Amino acid sequence: MISINNIAKGFSDKPVIEGVSAEFETGKCNLIIGASGSGKTVLMKCLVGLITPDAGEIMYDSENFSLMNTEAKKIMRRKIGMLFQGSALFDSKTVEQNIMFPLDMFSHDTRAEKQKRVDMVLDRVNLNGAHKKFPAEISGGMKKRVGIARSIVLNPQYLFCDEPNSGLDPQTSLVIDKLIREITTEYNITTVINTHDMNSVMEIGDRILYMYQGKKEWEGNSKEIIFSKNEKLNSFIFASDFLKDAKDMRMLEVSGKIDEKRNMDQLLNG
């Protein structure tokens, strides 16, 4: 579990996030959502140590990340997997070499052990046979899967995903969501996802933190979010493309209650 308490960060005396407290549960997909400029990206960067907060406390289970020195933070980061928005693959390296990179940086295993690990994670993300391909030779969805494989190759305890569905079509996004969900459960890791994709929220959002103008505005789960009475959250939901398909059965199935269609229609139509 990751716990944050009263996290604050500003730039040039302008506050960007103010007094944010939340818990991100182990074995769950914890989503941070909000409009552009809401502070969700800065919050995630604080969580992984790319930015130092001005105030507040970050706890990784029983370890206080906020009080760690530089060397201790380096050790902690080895327990963290990162899936970047643009996949951040090395164009000059093959798929295999991209995934091997963290192992070469941080692992003392033999070359054979490293290769076995690379083969295993490639198999897990259904990319057998792609070892020798270069990023330019594979699709956007495959690049995301390479990014996921690289993010878990060191057996992290914590996984951070920054806009994992950015640039993907809806069907591929669904595949990536499902893969992140499966890996979170199988590895029993704490997964934190920064997204504005409401389909992802409904598909895999175990816990949801909604940010508004640098503050925590709402916290709950995907079964509660559609029926929330929070006006700012509802405005964010109604502004998303998600509501174009909000009456489909997928949404009702996610809520777990087919008989709530009447409530859904009332919410959408007034």
Where are these regions (language model features)?
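Helix-to-loop junction immediately C-terminal to a conserved catalytic motif
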Residues: 48
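Conserved ABC transporter NBD signature motif
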Residues: 56-64
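Conserved ABC ATPase "signature" region
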Residues: 111-129
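Conserved ABC ATPase signature
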Residues: 134-138, 142
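A short, proline-enriched helix->beta-strand linker immediately N-terminal to the Walker B motif
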Residues: 153-157
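Catalytic Walker B motif of ABC-type/P-loop ATPase nucleotide-binding domains
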Residues: 159-162
